[in-house]
Amino acid sequence: MKIIPAIDLQNGEAVRLYKGDYDKKTVYSKNPLEIAQKFERMGATDLHLVDLDGAKIGQTRNLELVRKIKDETRLKIEIGGGIRDFDTVRMYLEQIGVERVILGTAAVEKPDFLKELLIKYGPSRIVVGVDIREGFVSTSGWLEKTSLPYLSFLKKLERIGVKTTIITDISKDGTLTGPNFKLYDEISKENSLNVIISGGVKDNSDIQRATRSDFYGIIVGKAYYEGKINLEKEFRNAN
C-alpha cells in the first residue's frame, strides 16, 4: 500500500484546511519545498500536492512551486486543484513531468474530456479525486455539492476506464478523528477501482488498518504536521 504524504499549497505556503473550509486554514510552512525534501529524507517515494488556489478558482496558481518541488526531489508527484483543461494537463505531465494529475471538478462536469485524457495518457497517469459530502459528490474545491450520489459516479468512472480514485470524506478532512473506513470498505466492495484513502487520518493505527484492508494507498496530512504520526516508521515498514 502506498503511504502518500500531502502538501496543500495556497499563496506559496503549505497549509491545511478544516473540513474543506477556506476560512479555517492553518499555515504550517512558508517553504513547501523544504517539507517535500524532508518527506523524501524520511523515506517517502510519492507526494500528494493540492493547489488550493487552483481548486477554488479553476486556474493553476502555484505552478512554479510545483515545478521546483519536482526538479529538486526524486518524489513521484501527483497534483490536483484547478486542472480543468487539456493545456494544464499537458503542462503538468509533459513539461513539468509529474507522474499523475488528479481531476475533480472536470471529471464531473466534462466526462468526454476525462475519456480523452485516459486515451492519451493512460489510466496510470490520470487519477480522479472524488470528494464526498453527505453522500454526494462535491466540486469546485469542495464548495459546491452536486446531486450526484457517489456510488453512481464511481460506477460511471469505472465504465469510462478510470483505474485509481482518491476518495475524500470532507466531513473527516483535517479533523484527526480517523478515516471513514465504513465508506471506504463499501466503495471497495462495490467496484474494482484502486482506492486511495484521504481525510481524517489521526495516527499510525489508521495506516495499519488501511494496510490490513489492502487499500491501494492512504494520504497523510494534518496528522503529520500536528505530530500525531510517525511517518518515518511507516515508510520503513512499507519498504
UniProtKB/Swiss-Prot annotation:
Cited Pfam families: His_biosynth (PF00977)
Biological pathway: Amino-acid biosynthesis; L-histidine biosynthesis; L-histidine from 5-phospho-alpha-D-ribose 1-diphosphate: step 4/9
An annotated Gene Ontology molecular function: 1-(5-phosphoribosyl)-5-[(5-phosphoribosylamino)methylideneamino]imidazole-4-carboxamide isomerase activity
Chief location bin: cytoplasm
Localization per Swiss-Prot or TrEMBL: Cytoplasm
Heme recorded as keyword: no
Any one cellular-component term (Gene Ontology): cytoplasm
Effect of residue 227 to K: In strain: IL1403
Keywords: Amino-acid biosynthesis, Cytoplasm, Histidine biosynthesis, Isomerase
Record InterPro entries: Aldolase_TIM (IPR013785), His_biosynth (IPR006062), HisA_bact_arch (IPR006063), Isoase_HisA-like (IPR044524), Isoase_HisA-like_bact (IPR023016), RibuloseP-bd_barrel (IPR011060)
Effect noted on mutating residue 71 to E: In strain: IL1403
Active site: 8 (proton acceptor), 131 (proton donor)
Reaction equations catalysed: 1-(5-phospho-beta-D-ribosyl)-5-[(5-phospho-beta-D-ribosylamino)methylideneamino]imidazole-4-carboxamide = 5-[(5-phospho-1-deoxy-D-ribulos-1-ylimino)methylamino]-1-(5-phospho-beta-D-ribosyl)imidazole-4-carboxamide
SUPFAM superfamilies: Ribulose-phoshate binding barrel
E.C. designation(s): 5.3.1.16
EC class of the enzyme, as a word: isomerase
GO BP term, pick one: L-tryptophan biosynthetic process
PANTHER family: 1-(5-PHOSPHORIBOSYL)-5-[(5-PHOSPHORIBOSYLAMINO)METHYLIDENEAMINO] IMIDAZOLE-4-CARBOXAMIDE ISOMERASE (PTHR43090:SF2)
HAMAP family: HisA
Family classification: Belongs to the HisA/HisF family.
Descriptive protein name: 1-(5-phosphoribosyl)-5-[(5-phosphoribosylamino)methylideneamino] imidazole-4-carboxamide isomerase
Organism annotation: Lactococcus lactis subsp. lactis (strain IL1403) (Streptococcus lactis)
